[in-house]
Design a protein with these regions (language model features):
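Catalytic cores of nucleotide-sugar-dependent glycosyltransferases that transfer UDP/GDP/TDP-activated
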Residues: 2, 12-532
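Short linear segments in intrinsically disordered or otherwise low-structure-confidence regions
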Residues: 4-6
């Protein structure tokens, strides 16, 4: 909707020790050891005084309030709000059809001229009910079309994606330069993932002193384009170098963000370490290792929003707490009914995930027999690759009453699965951060996960969940057997649930290292100005 206008427990300690003892040699199996050496969480060295709010612009391709394809949208919506008590944080997003037709009034507040083959566009402003300000990049020819932000209805990349997201990056640079006529300019720009990767680059090419942060949410998505498109996007020749944007004969929008930002972050400490190795580096491990040696790469764990509260969540059949598990049992009963599972008191395992290879769903199919043989039940919710979807359906047919599956996704069933299950399965081959394991712990469902990325950083093995190392069915099966062993000891299961629910995953805690980083970069900018 466009609107014309202008805009300026004592016993608990003993129980935890017992948990460790049970998990040390479960069913005769040795306890797993870390595949990646543990990485210390970032130490907070600078705390915001809150006295002087700084102006910060987030640049992102999706935002949960308006358009979402994955976890980037959740972070893009939650992190600015969490930081909003300390700073003036605003968000820039393309004006997709979903945004324009969201029902939120959009006031036109600025305009931008064309550059190279990037068209001119207008800037709209949405004022969300909670006070978050969103700038919308309005260009119908680039953004107002059916499909997702990145692909058409057939799942094919939009052919003009380089132009669409270069326009986003350039708009951020022009807003930072104060040339967008919106009566507001940021003191720091925070760009997210490859669609916003050119924002720090255009800022550099235009000689701006405004510091920038670039966050890698998933290194596997790189925004690689043909070298021939350089002139269309107004990319200078100097950028076509291995130390800048060049990547195996192409140009990478993700690498542009890494190369030109003042600081690079990713979404967990372990993932920050992993992406400097050949196994997880996706061809950029050398470049990222250099950034790490220079002290310019940090891993900052994501958080979750305040809506994940089991006592008051309106999506649940019944709320519950660590003092009263009746509500959890009510949600388990719903899950069994909705997924066609036998109504019996059995260990209930859940999958809430995209059904894709990265998430290790094929490994879950391999260990499902061990779950059923161990007396457990399995409920699967998700969608993704058609072959894996078909295999999930076949599994449910193979084990009627013990395995149930819904292909698709809805928030109500997802939250009730977290609340009703005993264990959440996350055998990801890699997981930059992951949020589901945090949701599960808040709702007393113990995650069983591979020790990788944010899973390693947010799950305490044998205390709040179960970790395994190798991405294979044998290691995964051992972790499942450990969980089944704990389920036979109700006092241990209860203690682990209580510990998991107490984990401090909310964004109000997670913003501290972001605030410290912003203050550091803004302080460095001030020092440079004083020297000049």
């Amino acid at each position: 909707m466009l609107v014309a206008g202008t805009g300026n427990a004592g016993a608990f300690g003993e129980i935890v020790m017992s948990i460790a003892a049970v998990n040390a040699r479960p069913l005769g199996l040795p306890k797993a050891q870390p595949a990646v050496p543990p990485v210390a969480r970032p130490a907070l060295q600078i705390r915001s005084s809150h006295d002087d709010k700084r102006k910060i612009l987030f640049v992102t391709s999706e935002l949960t309030d308006l358009v979402k394809t994955g976890g980037l949208a959740d972070v893009s919506a939650a992190l600015p709000r969490a930081l909003g008590a300390r700073h003036d944080v605003r968000v820039l997003i393309p004006g997709y059809s979903q945004v324009i037709n969201s029902g939120h009034p959009i006031r036109i507040v600025g305009s931008l001229s064309g550059y190279a083959e990037l068209p001119g566009c207008r800037i709209g402003r949405i004022d969300m009910p909670d006070g978050l300000i969103i700038y919308v990049l309005i260009s119908p020819e680039l953004y107002e079309r059916d499909g997702s932000p990145y692909v058409d209805g057939h799942g094919n990349d939009w052919q003009d994606n380089p132009v669409r997201f270069a326009r986003l990056g350039l708009a951020a640079a022009e807003i930072a330069a104060g040339t967008a006529c919106i009566s507001w300019a940021p003191e720091l720009v925070h760009a997210h993932d490859w669609p916003a990767g050119l924002a720090p680059a255009y800022m550099h090419w235009r000689g701006l002193s405004t510091p920038s942060v670039f966050t890698i949410h998933n290194l596997a998505y790189q925004g690689n384009i043909d070298m021939s498109q350089r002139r269309l996007l107004g990319i200078p020749g100097e950028a076509c170098d291995p130390e800048r944007m060049e990547f195996y004969g192409k140009l990478s929008l993700l690498k542009a963000g890494i190369a030109y930002a003042n600081h690079v972050t990713t979404v967990s400490s372990t993932y920050a370490r992993e992406i400097t190795t050949p196994e997880f580096g996706c061809g950029m491990e050398g470049f990222l290792s250099m950034k790490a040696r220079q002290g310019l790469l940090s891993g900052l764990l994501n958080g979750i929003d305040e809506s994940w509260e089991p006592e008051s969540d309106p999506y649940l059949v019944s709320g519950f707490s660590a003092r009263d598990w009746a509500g959890k049992q009510a949600n388990a009963a719903y899950v069994r009914d909705a997924f066609g599972l036998e109504k019996r008191d059995a260990p209930l395992f859940a999958v809430v995930s995209r059904l894709v290879y990265q998430k290790g769903v094929d490994l879950t199919l391999d260990v499902a027999h061990a779950i059923v043989e161990g007396g457990g039940q399995l409920a699967i919710l998700g969608q993704g690759e058609r072959q894996i979807e078909a295999q999930v359906r076949q599994l449910a047919e193979q084990y009627p009453g013990q395995v149930g599956a819904h292909i698709g996704f809805n928030e109500t069933d997802a939250r009730r699965l977290f609340a009703g299950s005993d264990f959440l399965l996350m055998p990801s081959r890699y997981e930059p951060c992951g949020l589901s394991q945090m949701y599960a712990q808040r709702y007393a469902s113990l995650p069983i996960a591979r020790r990788t990325g944010g899973l390693a950083d947010s799950i305490e093995d044998g205390i709040t969940g179960f970790l395994f190392d190798a991405p294979d069915a044998a290691s995964y099966r051992q972790a499942v057997q450990r969980a089944l062993a704990v389920h036979h000891h109700p006092e241990l299961l209860g203690a682990m649930r209580c510990r998991a629910m107490a984990a401090g995953f909310f964004w109000r805690h997670a913003i501290e290292p972001y605030d410290a980083l912003y203050q550091q970069l803004l302080g460095e900018r001030r020092e440079v100005r004083l020297l000049i």
